[in-house]
Amino acid sequence: MQISSRSGFGYFSYGIRLALTPGIRRFVVLPLLANIILVGGAMYYLFSHLDTWISEWIGQLPSFLSWLSYVLWPLLALTILATFSYFFSTLANFIASPFNGLLAEKVEQHLSGERIGEEGVWALVKDVPRILSREWRKLLYVLPKALGLFLLLLIPALGQTLGPIAWFLFTAWMLAIQYCDYPFDNHKISFHDMRNTLKQNQSKAYGFGMLVAFFTSIPIVNLFIVPVAVCGATAMWVMEFKTQHSPLRQ
């Protein structure tokens, strides 16, 4: 099946079509269930506390910047939603990572017509330790940067103005890494090489990640994002990156 090159936004939209494709849909179910359970519970908790958190945070602004509260409230709300959703989506992805990898494999097979690896339950079970190790590698990459940005948020005025923008861009980048990594990992391409490939294609990576971050912050919609993002990221791999790494395939 031939697909044309798209923008990062375009690959996300294409992911919706792929997730609904016959032959792919049955591999969407388990990642979808993990996301609904964890993110759904997190969103319920978040919305019961969101107004209080934002009011307390804006209250730290100096009085001469109080006029910014009208601008910052929606920006902070979006940032908190995106960050909260990213955290719990990451947890859901960690738990469902073997099934996300399987979904990426089936999408690539659908798009390229090539068999990617061994099939069957035993093949999936054998891959679980490697897949979970890869998820830990992502967490080790994320945590120091997330801590630095959290400290930025604690700086009066600066944290309330530049902090939300920095968090949104960081979330977009990390979501691009999170979902694009599944097809890379299926081909045993190192995390370092995957990250460098995305750095060389930042417009597509950020475009894709921003759209995932935006929809991840929308209640109800965010429950269905994981399989869509896996499908879209796999389409990006097939069209944009696969030929660059063909000598590395095993």
Curated annotation (Swiss-Prot):
Signal peptide: none annotated. GO terms for biological process: cysteine biosynthetic process; sulfate assimilation. Pfam families: EI24 (PF07264). The keyword Nucleotide-binding does not apply. Its main location: membrane. One of its GO terms (cellular component) is plasma membrane. It is found in: Cell inner membrane. It is a multi-pass membrane protein. The chain crosses the membrane at residues 27-47, 64-84, 150-170, 210-230. It comes from the Bacteria. The keyword Transport applies. GO terms for molecular function: high-affinity sulfate:proton symporter activity. PANTHER family: SULFATE TRANSPORTER CYSZ. High affinity, high specificity proton-dependent sulfate transporter, which mediates sulfate uptake. Provides the sulfur source for the cysteine synthesis pathway. Belongs to the CysZ family. This is Sulfate transporter CysZ. It comes from Vibrio cholerae serotype O1 (strain ATCC 39541 / Classical Ogawa 395 / O395). The gene is cysZ.
